Structures are given as C-alpha cells and as structure tokens.
C-alpha cells in the first residue's frame, strides 16, 4: 500500500462548508405575515410548540439530510436548532446518546458494525435495517425510522469514456480484469478500505479473487477522484455511491452484481421516549425522503460539493420543488 498526495481541484463548497457550525431555526422563508406555513407539510402536520435539536455529521450528505429535517419540522411549526459538522462516524450518534440532540441521521451499515459490534453483514438491505432497528432499540433505546430509498455504500468507479475500451461494468468483470491484468489494475483507496472487514476483503471473499495491495494508492477522496480521472496513478477508484463527484467527474459506477458491499441505508435515529412522544416525526421524515434514490441524492450532494451551494439552500429548494413547502 502506497500513500500519495497531489494538488487537487479546489471547490467552492469548501469555503461554504467551513462557515457552517451551529444554526438556530425559526425562519425558513416558508411562513407568511401571520405565521402560517405553506405547502403540504403545513397542511398535514402540526408540530407547534415542539422544540427539536438536530445533529449532523461533517460531510455534504449529512448536512443536506439534517437541513431537510430542520426545514420540514419548521414548516410544521416546530422550533429547531441544528448542530452541524460533528465528526464522523459517531459524532452525531454520541450527541444523541448524551441527550444533546433529539434527531440524527445515521446509516445502517455504520450502526451494524460500529455501534452494535457485528462482524458479518446481512445481505438484504431491508433485513439489515430491521435487525439494526430491533437491536439498537433493545440495547440502547434508540428508535430508527423507516429508511430512505438511497444506499450510500462503497463502490468502484472509473471514467465513462473508458467503459467501452475496458469492458468493466460489474464487479464480476472487475475481478476478471484484475486477474487477467496483473500489475496493471491499480486502485486508489482511502486509509481503511483495503483492510476493513466491510471493504475490499469482503469483496475479495464474495467475488473469489485477490487484489495485490502493492497496486493500491492511499489518499483522501478529493485526490482519489482527480487521480482516477487522470488515470494516474490509478485506473480504478474506491467511491461512495452517492458522492456528487461521480456525476461531476463523469465516472462510471461499477455494478456490485453479487451484493458484496454491506448496505448503508439512511434513517433518522431518535431516542425511544422522544419518538413515542412525537409520532408525527417518523411519518414526516419518511414522507420527505420517499423519492430520494441514489441518483437524486447524488445530484443533491453535487450541488454542495461541486457547485458550492449551501446545504440549507439545497434542502429548502428540494422540499419546495416537491411541494412540501411553499
């Protein structure tokens, strides 16, 4: 395994995200002079008098999801405070467990392995969510809402304009390419992917091949994306499947045709008592994310990471376009 660095593109999102810390809700631009909110949320939900604290991790997707929850609850009349940029993977989770937050988005794969201590993933994404929801409630008193449709798991990618030439469309194809081209199949990865149980070792087990670690170059994701676009020093890259850079850099996402990667569905976590006291919240969060599939989430992420939009603006625009707010 080799570590490498390279000057990468500077995105306007960097400056935007650095300005985000703690923001308090109350005025989301969806109320008229009399305080009456517009849109379907205001018609269907009543959260007047409810005070809610939202916690979000430190990357675009989490910031967008947190803002979606905040804007939606405010449209229903709640007063919302949001704390953002908590460190991954467990900053928001720790805030929830400590009583410093009421609502936090989390991923089933993270909970299954990191919080619940399981080594073997469950292949079916919904069955894994059901197991996480059951065990986290029993062990820690944490309630999980039904998940959004998108799955932000690991993946492999390379430039779209090389697909016809290289012929790698599935991970089965990729495994065959690696074995047929010893010494050529270089891969850019983050610091843990090549060794963590739910990363490359699981893919090698499921697809029955071995990838030479000497062909791997380790760096952060900003450098990973520019490197695979340049095809130097790697011709394939580890990615997250809803990363906006996949669209921005015109990368082809290789299909995980044997479901080798563990699922990372996203749900809202709430402590059991808070969830029971506020049953409208689970329904609200499910409704506003019901149409957010991988393509939609990737596009929203790109608005922040590539276009430099603020997460709160991206979230508000999405809810308005869907008719949830006026």
Q: Residue ranges of each PLM-predicted region?
A:
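Bacterial lipoprotein signal-peptidase II cleavage site
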Residues: 23-37
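Ligand-binding pocket segment of bilobal, Venus flytrap-like solute-binding proteins
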Residues: 180-256
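A conserved helix-loop-strand patch within extracytoplasmic ligand-binding domains
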Residues: 126-186, 290-294
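Short, well-ordered beta-strand elements
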Residues: 48-61, 79-84, 183-188
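Sec-dependent bacterial lipoprotein signal peptides
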Residues: 1-22
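A bilobed periplasmic-binding-protein/Venus flytrap-type ligand-binding module shared by bacterial periplasmic
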Residues: 154-164, 264-278
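Short, polar/charged alpha-helical segment
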Residues: 60-79, 197, 204-205
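Ligand-binding "clamshell"
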Residues: 115-125, 130-145, 231-234, 245-258
């Amino acid at each position: 395994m080799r570590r490498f660095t390279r000057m990468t593109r500077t995105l306007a999102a960097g400056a935007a995200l650095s300005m985000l810390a703690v923001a308090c809700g109350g005025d989301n631009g969806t109320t008229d002079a009399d305080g009456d909110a517009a849109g379907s949320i205001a018609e269907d939900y009543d959260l007047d008098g409810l005070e809610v604290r939202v916690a979000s991790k430190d990357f675009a997707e989490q910031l967008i999801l947190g803002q979606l929850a905040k804007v939606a609850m405010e449209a229903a009349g709640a007063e919302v405070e949001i704390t953002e940029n908590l460190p991954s993977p467990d900053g928001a989770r720790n805030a929830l467990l400590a009583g410093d937050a009421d609502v936090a988005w989390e991923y089933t794969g993270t909970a299954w392995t990191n919080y619940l201590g399981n080594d073997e993933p469950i292949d079916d994404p919904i069955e894994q969510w059901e197991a996480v929801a059951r065990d986290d409630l029993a062990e820690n008193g944490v309630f999980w809402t039904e998940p959004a449709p998108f799955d932000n798991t690991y993946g492999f990618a390379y430039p779209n304009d090389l697909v016809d030439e290289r012929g790698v469309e599935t991970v089965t194809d990729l495994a065959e390419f690696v074995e047929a081209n010893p010494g050529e199949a270089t891969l850019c990865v983050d610091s843990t992917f090549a060794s963590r149980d739910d990363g490359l070792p699981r893919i090698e087990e499921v697809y029955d091949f071995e990838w030479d670690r000497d062909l791997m170059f380790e760096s952060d994701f900003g450098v990973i994306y520019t490197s695979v676009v340049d095809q130097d020093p790697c011709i394939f890259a580890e990615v997250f499947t809803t990363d906006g850079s996949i669209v921005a850099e015109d990368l082809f996402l290789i299909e995980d045709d044997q479901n080798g990667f563990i699922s990372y569905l996203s749900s809202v976590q709430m402590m059991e008592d808070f969830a029971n006291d506020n049953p409208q919240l689970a329904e609200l969060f499910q409704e506003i994310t019901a149409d957010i599939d991988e393509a939609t989430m990737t596009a929203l992420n790109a608005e922040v990471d590539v276009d430099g939009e603020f997460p709160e603006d991206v979230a508000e625009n999405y809810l308005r376009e869907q008719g949830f707010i006026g």
